[in-house]
Each structure stands twice: as structure tokens, then as C-alpha cells.
Amino acid sequence: MLNNRIYLNKNNASDYWKGSCLASEASFHQIAPYIGKMKSSMAKVLINRYTKTAETILDPFVGSGTIALESIIAKRKIICSDINPYAVTLTNAKISAPRTLESALKKANKYLELAQINKKKVSMQKVPRWVKSFYHPKTLREVLALFNVLKRKQDYFMMACLLGILHHQRPGFLSYPASHLVPYLRSKKYPKDIYKEMYKYREVSPRLIAKIKRVYKRVPLLEEYSKRLCRRVSVDKLRLRKNSIDAIITSPPYMNALDYARDNRLRMWFLGYGKFEKYDKPINNRAKFIKLMERGLQIFHRVLKKDGKCILVIGQVRKSRRHINVAKIVVDLAVKKIKGFECKEMIEDVIPDIRRSRRHAQGSKKEWIVVLIKKN
């Protein structure tokens, strides 16, 4: 049983994922941005350190799909879910992508032809003013026409590629000058009367094709793609057999440190979820967080096999000028309240400013990797 001390792993495991992995990771990870996503190098270490080939991993807070894709690369079976539609789209794009660049381009050209035929039928009347403010009208019509085709075909990969170029100031993107990670216009830095070229019509077709080619720059060697798609379901609605999961590797939401839906509101709108607020249910106090995690840990204990591992990546939260060790709360719940779990190790990982999306926000500056073992 764990006492009140915090146990640290003697080996400095976090050294394995220090530094940027953008130039070496599978480029599927870069299909579209996702705020606060787990580094692929961390996911790789956790999967290889705590699971074996062909074992089944569960990630019920899948986010950008990092664990899901790295699990398939490592020849593990993956079951994953999330309540955020953008997270589900992004994850399914990564785990069900066309096998080759050639097949992806063939599908893209087919969809672009269909969108071209149907774009005159697209109505702009119900498009909110704030969405219109990001695009040249001709570009927006093309984007809407293509999304209509992709949603009808349920092609997650193509949708994710299009979502990945929705907004930025660079020439390869579709919007007026804007931030890439979080949607806000940069009209003060790039005023229209000075930077007229940046406010002209941007054709969708060549930009989508170029994006797809970038995504296939470093294709992972996948013997088998996931046979299960990521589902949009909350953790308490998961229907899994008792003692069926070898390991859980996930990063649960912690005390409202990030606003995933708000930060992806433009992408959410194009996916058909205009009221993004309902997907950011704030876990903004200790009581709500404890309730969520207690229920989650009960479910995790039920579905894990005996001696199965539950690896939770949890950030340290700052509230009212003090830091809250959320990991300690989770360990106490698992070991003392739920029981049946033993804490094997806790690994501290300091998040450098370059990895944080909001440099001056009250977010996480430190992460804990909590490793729990199911004992009975």
C-alpha cells in the first residue's frame, strides 16, 4: 500500500522523451493541431515500457490519438474513445488512413471533383458571421462544399487533413491571417490595407493535395490498422468486458486546465458542432474532479486484468497562486478509496515553456506519470 510519500521512479524515464520529436515522429501525428497533446515520444516509451506485443490497450480520453497511433505502430490492439468530436475525428484519421499516398491522392481528387460540381448549391445564409470573418467568400464556399462531401462519405482522414489547413497565415492554409493552434484573426499584425495578398481567394484543391503529401512524409510501418474506430462516448458509458484489458494508458482531463472545444471551435463548427460549449464541461474544482476520477478508476479496475497496469499522465494544476498535485489526489483515490490498486511508480516530467500552448496561462507546468497495478 502507498503511504503519503510521493514515489519517484529511480530511473529518469523522462529523459527518453526530452526534446522535440517533430522531425522524427510519424507524420500522421501532425495531420492537424491539438492543444495540450501528448508527445509521441512519451507515448512510445510508455507503451513499450509497460505493455507487450499483441496486448490490448485502452485510452478512454484519447484526445489527438497519440496513444492510439503509437499502439498500432508497436503492434498492440487499441480501444479508444473521447467525448470531443474533433478528438474522435482526428484519432480515426490516424488509425484508418489510406495505406499509401497514391490511394489517398486518388480519393482526394475524387472528392474535390464532387465538391466542385456541388459548390454552387452551398448556402452561405446560415454560416455565422464569426466563421465568415476568417475566409474569402469564394474560399469558404469551396471549404463548405468539400466538407459536405467528406461528411457524407464519413472519410475521417480527409476531414482531418482539411481541418489541419483551416486557419493560419501561411500560404498553404485557407484562412485570412490567423493563429494556427487556436482560432483568432491576426488582423492587427497583418492589416488588410498593407497585406492585401493575404486576404485574397485561396483555392482549396492545391492546398489539400499539398497537405496530404506532407502527412505521408514519414509513414509508419503498420502491419495492421485498428479494426475498431474511435467512439464518441464518455468513460462511464464504455461497454467493456470485465478483466478484458491488459493496460490503460491515458491522460484524463484535470481541473479545467485546458478548454479543448473552445480552442477548436472553428474546426468543431465545420464538423457540424456549432455549440462547442457543451463539449467543454468544466471540471473546475476538486470535488468534481474527484467524482470523475473515482468513477473512472472504478471502471478501470473492473475492465483491467489482474496485474494489469493503469498509466495516467496527469498535470499539476495552478489555482489561486498555489499548485495542486492532482496526481497525489488520484493515487490516494486508487489506493485508499477504490482499493485494489497499488502504485508502482510516479515519474515527474517538467513541461518547458516551448511545449505549453499558453505561456502565461494558469495551466500545467509539470506532469506526473502515475503507474497503478490492479492487485485484486
Model features per residue range: what roles?
Residues 1-52:
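S-adenosyl-L-methionine
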Residues 29-34, 126-138, 281-291, 312-328:
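Acceptor-substrate binding/catalytic loop of class I
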Residues 43, 55-74, 78-85, 91, ...:
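Conserved proline-anchored active-site loop of SAM-dependent methyltransferases
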Residues 86-154, 272-280:
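Conserved phosphoryl-transfer catalytic core
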Residues 131, 253-292, 318:
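Mobile active-site "lid"/loop adjacent to the S-adenosyl-L-methionine
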Residues 140-249, 255:
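SAM-dependent nucleic-acid methyltransferase catalytic core
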Residues 290-306:
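A short glycine-rich, Lys/Arg-flanked "PGG" loop and its adjoining helix->strand segment in the class I
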Residues 318, 324-327, 331, 338-376:
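Class I S-adenosyl-L-methionine
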